[in-house]
Amino acid sequence: MRLLPEWFLLLFGPWLLRKAVSAQIPESGRPQYLGLRPAAAGAGAPGQQLPEPRSSDGLGVGRAWSWAWPTNHTGALARAGAAGALPAQRTKRKPSIKAARAKKIFGWGDFYFRVHTLKFSLLVTGKIVDHVNGTFSVYFRHNSSSLGNLSVSIVPPSKRVEFGGVWLPGPVPHPLQSTLALEGVLPGLGPPLGMAAAAAGPGLGGSLGGALAGPLGGALGVPGAKESRAFNCHVEYEKTNRARKHRPCLYDPSQVCFTEHTQSQAAWLCAKPFKVICIFVSFLSFDYKLVQKVCPDYNFQSEHPYFG
């Protein structure tokens, strides 16, 4: 019976110790902080509870971990705003709202034609952009390797495709606002392909270029009085680049000939008087002439343009 107290302490000692500790630390839903340093003069006994730490924002009591963001700071923000110490907040970016959007009806290549022969090559491409506000823009570029005259005009759908009047000489009329013709873009460039550069006279290119530009500009480049009242256009951009390339002559490979390469770009802004607007393209050189009318359909958006 002497060993009874020892067995009693071994069996019930841990249970009694837990009871004693729980009596000193009251239960609470929040974690408690115990002082681990010696108590100072006038301070409480060791084991006294310390106040919970404040958050770095001054918005209330911090949570169990320093990186835990408080769930609701409405009351604290209201109090801070009343005191004049409202913390800075991030401004939210608003999505950009486009006031107006240009409606692109056709892509690059709405009207085009390509001619490639043994003596020269010609490429004309363009596009039409409808701005929805009653105006449209015509963008045009061409690349040629032969002396000649090129004309691009805006015409109504009733314009006939014919060669009549192209070769008749006559004075060049005064250009109108509605004229979209590159008159005189290719005058005086030099002899055609196949003629030796040494044999070219100084007046050959100039006289021929003027003779070609006059009749063609009058017949195809400038619309009539009725069309000039209907169309209202002005040039926004115009640029022309010329380059001369040498190559062996076709009739005599021992001689050196040259070809004229011309690249031009232009853009016009016009009013839209008709539902369908056609582009009239004409090209006239020494041994080749071409006229073509392209009428894109504004009601049907297609990748392939309509050639009239």
From Swiss-Prot:
Keywords linked to the UniProt accession: Glycoprotein, Repeat, Secreted, Signal
Subcellular location: Secreted
PTM comment: May be proteolytically processed at the boundary between the N-terminal non-conserved and the central conserved domain in neuron-like cells.
Ranges where the record places region II: 24-84
Chain segments carrying region III: 85-163
Ranges annotated as spanning the membrane: none
A cellular component term, taken from the record's GO annotations: GABA-ergic synapse
Glycosylated residues in this chain: 72, 133, 143, 149
GO biological processes: modulation of chemical synaptic transmission; neuropeptide signaling pathway
Residue numbers spanned by region V (Cys-rich): 225-308
Pfam families registered for this protein in UniProt: Neurexophilin
The keyword Signal appears for this protein: yes
Tissue expression from the record: Expressed in brain, spleen, and testis.
InterPro entries registered for this protein in UniProt: Nxph, NXPH/NXPE
Record region (Disordered): 40-59
GO molecular function: signaling receptor binding
Signal peptide segment: 1-23
Region called IV (linker domain), residue ranges: 164-224
Biased composition (Low complexity): 40-51
Family statement drawn from the similarity comment of this UniProt entry: Belongs to the neurexophilin family.
UniProt cross-references to PANTHER family, sorted A to Z: NEUREXOPHILIN (PTHR17103), NEUREXOPHILIN-4 (PTHR17103:SF10)
Purpose: May be signaling molecules that resemble neuropeptides and that act by binding to alpha-neurexins and possibly other receptors.
Protein name stated in the entry: Neurexophilin-4
UniProt source species: Homo sapiens (Human)
